[in-house]
A protein has these predicted regions:
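Polysaccharide-binding surfaces and accessory modules of carbohydrate-active proteins
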Residues: 5, 10-13, 17, 21, ...
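Contiguous, structured surface segment used for ligand recognition
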Residues: 24-27
């Protein structure tokens, strides 16, 4: 029961021992986040709300919670993928092509509507360990060169603001110095450009709101990469916190 799919609603639920992670495909074909938190047994209760414009000052792409936002359209938030095509275009517009399940892995298939370019979003569920692994595979099916300017593994949505971000920093002889930082409006960026593991920043995030050793919610994630990486933690004007990790 690690992967539960409601095909009628186009909703996908990743169920681990104590947690649920739910997303789906909306009326515009966007992969949208619905829930991440304590386990909900009956995932059929989830519906994909129709995406409607709040006002002309709030574009659809600003208010929607995308699992994998790409560069283009009226997206002013951080994007996971940016590419340059042979004709100079840098805008991606994807369509949903379907899904595959192989054991504990769910693959969401996306395709650009203008170029022969595929993106597959991979989700692996490790039920006993309460872990979800995410990554993306990108394929250029044409004979033309496509330059990838940026790629992150995915975006996480945390339904709170004013969180505390924890990580470690350091230098030679003083590694692993723990620090905390209040997340406010704007972005926190952690990165490494050295090409190897470094003591300056570590590729993970821990976010909480007044959590203790025994109480409270803690959201965390780590990038399975020891070389160049980048991470962004962003608090939006809509009362949530976004997190991305990926290759720098």
């Amino acid at each position: 029961m690690g992967i539960v799919i409601n095909e009628l609603k186009n909703v996908f639920a990743l169920q681990s021992k104590n947690n649920s992670y739910v997303f789906g495909i909306d009326n515009m074909g966007l992969v949208r986040h619905l829930y991440w938190g304590s386990k909900i047994e009956n995932v059929d209760d989830f519906d994909m709300p129709t995406l409607v414009e709040v006002s002309t000052n709030d574009p659809d792409f600003e208010i929607t919670k995308e699992e994998f936002p790409v560069y283009g359209s009226l997206r002013y938030k951080e994007h996971c993928l940016k590419a340059s095509f042979i004709d100079g275009c840098r805008e991606l517009v994807y369509s949903y092509e379907g899904y595959e399940v192989d054991g504990n892995e769910l693959v969401i298939k996306l395709k650009d509507i203008h170029y022969d370019f595929n993106m597959n979003l991979h989700y692996k569920v490790y039920e006993e360990y309460d872990l979800i692994e995410r990554y993306v595979t990108i394929k250029n099916n044409s004979e033309n060169v496509i330059e990838i300017e940026k790629v992150h593994s995915g975006q996480f949505h945390i339904p709170y603001e004013d969180l505390t971000f924890s990580n470690v920093h350091g230098h030679w002889g003083a590694e692993q110095q723990r620090f905390t930082q209040k997340v406010s409006y704007g972005k926190i960026v952690i990165e490494n450009r050295r090409g190897i593991s470094t003591h300056n920043h570590n590729p993970y995030f821990i976010l909480d709101k007044n959590a203790t050793e025994t109480t409270g919610e803690v959201f965390f994630g780590a990038l399975k990469l020891s070389g160049n990486f980048s991470g962004v933690i962003e608090q939006t004007q809509y009362g949530e916190t976004l997190v991305q990790l990926g290759i720098n």
